[in-house]
Amino acid sequence: MLDLGLSKMALIGVVALVVLGPERLPRVARTAGALFGRAQRYINDVKAEVSREIELDALRTMKTDFESAARNVETTIHDNLREHEKELNDTWHSAVGGLNEAAGDAGSTGSDTAAPSWRGSTAALAPKRRNWRVKQAAAPAWYKRATTRRTHVQSGAARVARHQPASLRRPTRFF
């Protein structure tokens, strides 16, 4: 940048003293120092912002790399699952086809009787319909209290008076 040694700075100070005079020199020096400080702060802010942007850019690239790796893993898993599912379906269909042929050779006329015996037991495994009343009764009491309509409505002043300690209440006078 600037190559200012001690001798050059002393020369600039002497010239400034001669040109500006002793009355205005301190004020000009303060102003110059303040401007120099502002310039340094501005440069430091710019440096910090540039370094933050560089870090953010590095984080963005790491994020995209991670997302692409996750997508690759996901597609690999899905492909493997589809492949195994296809193999299982092919095996299942070949086994069911063999059962249907055997049942057809035995003289069955309907396709309903050719179904495997385990299909009849699926009705027992079907999920039962849930009772609506049981679900309604499962709500906590505090929730029921908070959501129901209020039957005893009080004004704000009455509510404050109701919950105010006895020591803070005004004494009541009866005439």
From Swiss-Prot:
It comes from the Bacteria. InterPro entries: TatA/B/E, TatB. It is a single-pass membrane protein. GO terms for cellular component: TAT protein transport complex. It holds the Pfam family TatA_B_E. The keyword Plastid does not apply. It is found in: Cell inner membrane. Residues 155-175 are annotated as: Disordered. Keywords: Cell inner membrane, Cell membrane, Membrane, Protein transport, Translocation, Transmembrane, Transmembrane helix, Transport. The keyword Cell cycle does not apply. The chain crosses the membrane at residues 1-21. One of its GO terms (biological process) is protein transport by the Tat complex. One of its GO terms (molecular function) is protein transmembrane transporter activity. Belongs to the TatB family. Part of the twin-arginine translocation (Tat) system that transports large folded proteins containing a characteristic twin-arginine motif in their signal peptide across membranes. Together with TatC, TatB is part of a receptor directly interacting with Tat signal peptides. TatB may form an oligomeric binding site that transiently accommodates folded Tat precursor proteins before their translocation. The Tat system comprises two distinct complexes: a TatABC complex, containing multiple copies of TatA, TatB and TatC subunits, and a separate TatA complex, containing only TatA subunits. Substrates initially bind to the TatABC complex, which probably triggers association of the separate TatA complex to form the active translocon. This is Sec-independent protein translocase protein TatB. The gene is tatB.
